[in-house]
């Protein structure tokens, strides 16, 4: 069975605008096109679309996705190179997670400060500088992450 872009949008939840953009970038070179220029997606194409959507959500560049797709098309001889691409993206995303954890910890610290100040009825205070907050929390978060890493390794 084949599907038009609008049908794929309904089926996948991915906007037709995104799909068309990715089509224009060459991420779907093997789509069937009828005499009127209407492109049709197979189930396999929809599966690839879902992977593209995930890779984009993870921050992978279109260029890297194109390269990855080209490697996939070449078959098993490119497995190691594809593995390296996936591992590199995973490493980037794990680094982003650590940065987000630090940022969330800073927000929680500020939140707790405001809760304490408002519960005591204080309206004037001297907040810690951003740098000071970050240094304190970086140390705490890094210790927490190291503890979690040690648990995972056991």
What would you call each of these model-derived segments?
Residues 67-70, 74, 80, 84-86:
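Long, amphipathic alpha-helical segments that form or neighbor coiled-coils/leucine zippers used
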Residues 51, 70-73, 91-94, 98:
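A broad detector of the eukaryotic-type serine/threonine protein kinase catalytic domain
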Residues 25, 71-74, 113, 117:
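A short linear boundary/processing microfeature
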Residues 80-154:
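C-terminal regulatory/oligomerization modules of transcriptional regulators
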Residues 14, 60, 74-78, 95, ...:
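Alpha-helical structural elements of signaling/regulatory helical domains
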Residues 1-70:
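Basic helix-turn-helix/winged-helix DNA-binding cores
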Residues 10-13, 49, 75, 83, ...:
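Helix-centric, low-specificity signal for extended rod-like, repetitive segments
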